[in-house]
């Protein structure tokens, strides 16, 4: 590890820390050590792993100020937002630790009439070693949705944090080491893209990735060379649907927060709003009033921070320019709102659906508000996207009906972001927003495999699965199938 790289504070460019770049050989060694530790981690059993994970969650929250400050330094987000991220993180660790045994309990299945002499069970076992590649926007919360659940299921984990937040990743390993019964259970490796690619091809049994759709496709392709399954949590262009009967004050407050918090760097952040034309003017007026009270700035000075990844400024700028060129209008802010590394709030209205500003993920504090004649039109426009991560609905009476027609992985009715904080429900998307799930029983089962075990309880006189099967037995089977109409299985 002769080569190193630095992480910097995006607000001022100051170096936060220097970290090693793991080579492919070194990544392989770490994965090998994790595999060696795997058998002992499994032997601890659910109760033993639960104790370790609950101790870890306690250690993290007891040192919340330390890790929150590091998150703030590497991402530029306010300390209060970093604290909220940590609090939500420990909730997920605790839930996974407490529920893993129940979720993985052996299930008994009906064998069906034809195989009534058999017992049928399905067992769940850990995969072995899970690789996790994390993002920079929520550097402890998001990867923990894979890490904690994989560990609770009995896997060991090798984690590569984003090159923008390596310090957070190293802190996670150090905090785990403080309570770990032995080495190799959870290990952090640092580096750039080559290190992440090495993890994909290192022999891990599954890989979980959070990041852009473009990079996710490269990750999936690399993992495919070794037939390694993946969980991909990718980008979004999340819509907000505002019906005429919505509580506008609550809808505006939540939508503007969703769009602007964390400098708009949230995969489930509001990027496009479809509001019923009957209340559109009032909604836009309230949105402008709220946005005008917000300011981007360094932690302690702004409501939200800088763009963590410098190149994202170019994407934000190009989308705002495209929106105006294509016929949209500024309702609040202008191109002057973009002053690297900060982006002040921008509200765009009446942007054509074909514009790149509507079609592509912006990942900045920019929101588009378009009028619709009905919720039917809003649903059609919301679904007309290559993304399908989350959605928000604001309506007093139509929420469930609208939700059932949306093509996405998660929906919040009269709320925002809430599905990410509820540990018992799965998080993930469809279409170009990825596949697989984190969180909840579904998320934990991602890091297990099913083993079917069937056993003969009673030996039948009929020779069915045998070369000694007779024509009479064949006729009996067909007659039974006809009478039972498919209920043999």
Task: List each language-model region with its residue ranges.
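N-terminal Rossmann-like NAD(P)+-binding subdomain of aldehyde/semialdehyde dehydrogenases
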Residues: 1-118
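Conserved C-terminal structural/oligomerization subdomain of aldehyde/semialdehyde dehydrogenase
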Residues: 9-18, 241, 342-489
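Residue-level signal for inorganic ion chemistry
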Residues: 13, 49, 71, 93, ...
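Short, well-ordered beta-strand elements within core beta-sheets of diverse protein domains
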Residues: 15-22, 36-43, 132, 240-242, ...
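ALDH superfamily catalytic-core signature
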Residues: 16, 214-352, 413, 475, ...
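Structural signal for hydrophobic packing residues in well-ordered secondary-structure cores
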Residues: 35-38, 42, 57-64, 68, ...
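Rossmann-like NAD(P) dinucleotide-binding subdomain of oxidoreductase/dehydrogenase enzymes
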Residues: 109-250, 372, 488
């Amino acid at each position: 590890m002769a080569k190193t790289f630095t992480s910097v504070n995006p607000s001022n460019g100051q170096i936060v820390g220097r970290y090693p770049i793991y080579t492919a050989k070194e990544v392989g060694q770490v994965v090998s050590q994790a595999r060696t530790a795997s058998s002992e981690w499994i032997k601890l059993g659910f109760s033993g792993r639960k104790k370790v994970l609950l101790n870890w969650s306690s250690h993290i929250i007891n040192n919340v100020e330390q890790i929150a400050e590091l998150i703030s330094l590497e991402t530029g987000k306010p300390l209060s937002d970093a604290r909220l991220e940590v609090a939500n993180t420990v909730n997920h660790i605790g839930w996974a630790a407490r529920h893993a045994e129940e979720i993985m309990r052996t299930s008994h299945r009906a064998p069906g009439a034809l195989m009534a002499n058999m017992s049928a069970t399905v067992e769940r076992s850990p995969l072995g070693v899970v690789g996790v590649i994390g993002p920079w926007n929520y550097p402890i919360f998001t990867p923990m949705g894979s890490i904690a659940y994989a560990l609770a299921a009995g896997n060991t984990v090798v984690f590569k944090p984003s090159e923008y937040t390596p310090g957070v990743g190293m802190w996670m390993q150090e905090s785990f080491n403080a309570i770990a019964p032995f080495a190799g259970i959870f290990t952090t490796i640092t580096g750039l893209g080559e290190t992440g690619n090495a993890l994909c091809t290192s022999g891990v049994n599954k890989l979980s990735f959070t990041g852009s759709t473009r990079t996710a496709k490269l990750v999936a392709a690399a993992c495919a060379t070794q037939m390694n399954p993946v969980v991909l949590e990718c980008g979004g262009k999340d819509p907000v649907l505002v019906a005429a009967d919505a509580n506008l004050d609550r809808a505006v407050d939540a939508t503007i927060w969703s769009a602007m918090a964390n400098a708009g760097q949230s995969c489930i952040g509001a990027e496009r709003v479809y509001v019923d034309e009957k209340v559109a003017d009032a909604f836009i007026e309230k949105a402008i009033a709220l946005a005008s009270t917000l300011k981007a700035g360094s932690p302690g000075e702004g409501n939200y921070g800088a763009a963590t990844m410098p190149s994202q400024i170019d994407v934000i700028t190009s989308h705002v320019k495209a929106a105006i060129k294509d016929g949209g209008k500024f309702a609040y802010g202008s191109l002057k709102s973009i002053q690297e590394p900060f982006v002040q709030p921008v509200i765009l209205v009446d942007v054509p659906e074909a514009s790149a500003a509507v079609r592509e993920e912006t990942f900045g504090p920019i929101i588009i508000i378009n009028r619709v004649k009905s919720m039917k039109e809003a649903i059609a426009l919301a679904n007309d996207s290559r993304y399908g991560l989350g959605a928000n609905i604001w309506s007093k009476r139509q929420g469930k009906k609208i939700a059932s027609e949306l093509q996405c992985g998660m929906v919040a009715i009269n709320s925002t972001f809430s599905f990410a904080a509820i540990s018992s429900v799965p998080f993930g998307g469809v279409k170009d927003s990825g596949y697989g799930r984190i969180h909840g029983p579904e998320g934990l089962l991602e890091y297990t495999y099913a083993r079917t075990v069937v056993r003969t309880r009673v030996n039948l006189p009929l020779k069915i699965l045998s070369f000694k099967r007779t024509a009479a037995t064949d006729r009996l089977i067909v007659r039974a199938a006809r009478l039972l109409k498919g209920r043999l299985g």
